[in-house]
Amino acid sequence: KEGYIVDYHTGCKYTCAKLGDNDYCVRECRLRYYQSAHGYCYAFACWCTHLYEQAVVWPLPNKRCK
């Protein structure tokens, strides 16, 4: 599974400025999911790959980014 990392409180994606390989996104994906996850900056938000099927990613059901 893959998808944008999401803040559970706001419903917003984690933003990033440096597109492509991005240490911040890799770190956040691994902290949020697990060590084998990978991340990069895509469309100015952190995109995570190699996630488990039950991983919660953006968009959250019934929660819109404010």
Curated annotation (Swiss-Prot):
For this protein's source organism, the top of the classification is:
Eukaryota, Metazoa, Ecdysozoa, Arthropoda, Chelicerata
The disulfide bridges present are C12-C65, C16-C41, C25-C46, C29-C48
Per the record, residues carrying Lysine amide are K66
Give all residue intervals belonging to the LCN-type CS-alpha/beta domain: 1-66
Q: Which UniProt keywords apply?
A: Amidation, Disulfide bond, Ion channel impairing toxin, Neurotoxin, Secreted, Toxin, Voltage-gated sodium channel impairing toxin
GO cellular component terms, A-Z: extracellular region
Give the species: Centruroides bonito
Identify the InterPro entries for this entry. LCN-type_CS_alpha_beta_dom, Scorpion_toxin-like, Scorpion_toxin-like_sf, Scorpion_toxinL, Scorpion_toxinL/defensin
According to its UniProt entry, the protein's GO biological process terms are: defense response
Q: Domain comment, in the record's words?
A: Has the structural arrangement of an alpha-helix connected to antiparallel beta-sheets by disulfide bonds (CS-alpha/beta).
Note on file? Negative results: does not modify the currents of the human voltage-gated sodium channels Nav1.1/SCN1A, Nav1.2/SCN2A, Nav1.3/SCN3A and Nav1.7/SCN9A.
Q: What is this protein called?
A: Beta-toxin Cbo4
Query: Which family does the entry's similarity section mention?
Result: Belongs to the long (4 C-C) scorpion toxin superfamily. Sodium channel inhibitor family. Beta subfamily.
One GO molecular-function entry:
toxin activity
What's this protein's function?
Answer: Beta toxins bind voltage-independently at site-4 of sodium channels and shift the voltage of activation toward more negative potentials thereby affecting sodium channel activation and promoting spontaneous and repetitive firing. Is active on the human voltage-gated sodium channels Nav1.4/SCN4A, Nav1.5/SCN5A and Nav1.6/SCN8A when tested at 200 nM. In vivo, is toxic to mice when intraperitoneally injected.
